[in-house]
């Protein structure tokens, strides 16, 4: 990359392709994270449209100011994306220092995620129409999201050969393609077995656990729609997403005394500080194991 090239001369797609390669191959970031970072950087490049060698903190601040209609949390995410991008520019020799180091991140209030009560979780499970194999799939999806605390990308990416139901666990591919073993309780396991037994014979060799009516992997958007549709059927008016089940999973475990570091391992968090957000519900002493304390593992 030449330092004296303008963004309008150095096609945005070329920059993004090179940056995309860096994120995937050198930073080992997940596909979703790479897509998010590149989306933010693309918006910035179109806003900046000048000599990259002259990039400074004022340009970063101006771009963030132009996005003032978005939340502080989104601004913080964008700044993180740009900081990573500028680190790459330093590595490439385009700029000497990272201008984002001089930009203060937006002050964020303590984020308390929305959670479902145990009773609301049960209402959603009961609201699923299991008269077809697709209904059995939806029930199994909800049970796995809540029973294992998976991210939606982890759930729709779950492969049949990653199920070890006799051993009571599943193998999950998380962020950065990092693997972890996650215990699975009886209700989620039974729902999976019931669903897999009902899948059409023509899809018996399908690679992914959760598939659509054509036998291909269920998309993230389809999973979102399934959760929202089921919430409406259950009469729940909260803003519900697949991630709500993950929040509820963690909160209910900690409420019932599960050890914070066990929950951290289950969620696949790099740092226990990320998991500590769930301690806002209950300050009681944490003890025993996840299996003992999840409300749907009894």
List each model region and its residues.
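Conserved catalytic core of the tyrosine transesterase superfamily
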Residues: 1-298
